A protein has these predicted regions:
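Sec-dependent N-terminal signal peptides
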Residues: 4-13
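Active-site catalytic motif of lipid deacylating hydrolases and related acyltransferases
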Residues: 15-127
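Serine-dependent carboxylesterase/thioesterase catalytic core
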Residues: 61, 69, 91-93, 101, ...
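Short aromatic-enriched loop/helix-cap "lid" or pocket-rim segments at secondary-structure transitions
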Residues: 75-76, 167-170, 200-205
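Glycine-rich, phosphate-binding/catalytic loops in enzymes
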Residues: 78-82, 147-148, 171-175, 207-209
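C-terminal catalytic-base region of ester-bond hydrolases, centering on the histidine
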Residues: 175-243
Length: 243
């Protein structure tokens, strides 16, 4: 029994050590072959990016990742270059880590609580942007319906299956939507990829991005960008360079 307890302790310790406590700009590895999942291997919550030369701290940007299948070896890599791009604005940047296997509505509530806490602890902020991709775009869109504070929030939802998606668990509500009604305190933009160019959507019978946004804007991204297909993950970079 002691042998098994020792093995369990070592396993738990190794798992704990894989969660990074810092989030530093100069530790983000842009080359895919060198990527070590530094961005994603951390506790749930909102993490501030360190090492940014901030010249304006009155507003900032929160980024929200998507879903990762089991065994995916480069979790979070699609966000590295976009986050570096956002850091050039010289404003505070945060990364929102959540359990992508949890129900999206629960993750939206969690984002609400964490954002509320962030605002409370940073009284110098007068506005925030939140950029969500894929499942993160669903989470931020559900958040955009719920936000009831006077504090202004700008939401950018990128390549998100807003019309419907599989349940994340037996207790999760099945998302089947035709419409999102955005809160009056939120400025909302949906960025849609061209379905045929999006590896996550192109083989589906319908485009899960097709919904009506009541109180927001919906924009279709170009098919190509810099002589390459503008697909599911590259769409983040396009938006971060063009907003």
């Amino acid at each position: 029994m002691n042998k098994y307890l020792s093995l369990f302790f070592l396993f738990f310790l190794s798992c704990s050590e894989s969660d990074y406590s810092d989030l530093l700009l100069n530790k983000l590895k842009i080359n895919k072959s060198d990527y070590d999942e530094y961005l994603i291997n951390r506790s749930n919550g909102i993490h501030k990016l360190g090492g940014v030369n901030e010249t304006d701290s009155t507003w900032g940007i929160i980024t929200a990742h998507g879903y990762y299948p089991m065994g995916w070896s480069t979790k979070g890599f699609e966000w590295v270059s976009p986050i570096v791009e956002l850091s050039h604005r010289q404003i505070p940047v945060w990364f929102f880590k959540y359990d992508w296997n949890d129900c999206p509505e629960y993750s939206a509530d969690y984002l609400y609580r964490e954002t509320d806490k962030l605002i409370e602890n940073n009284s110098h902020l007068d506005s925030l942007w939140i950029i969500g991709h894929s499942l993160g775009g669903v989470v931020t869109s559900l958040f955009a319906e719920k936000w009831e504070q006077d504090f202004p929030i700008t939401i950018h939802s990128i390549a998100a299956p807003l019309a419907g998606m599989e349940r994340r668990g037996p207790d999760c509500e099945y998302i089947s939507r035709e419409k999102y009604k955005i809160s009056s305190s939120v400025s909302y933009t949906q960025w849609k990829t061209v379905k045929a160019q999006d590896g996550a959507f192109k083989n589906l019978k319908f485009d899960p991005q097709e919904v009506f946004i009541d109180g927001g804007t919906s924009i279709l991204l170009p098919e190509m960008w810099k002589n390459s297909r503008l697909g599911h993950n590259r769409s983040i970079q396009w938006v971060c360079e063009n907003i």
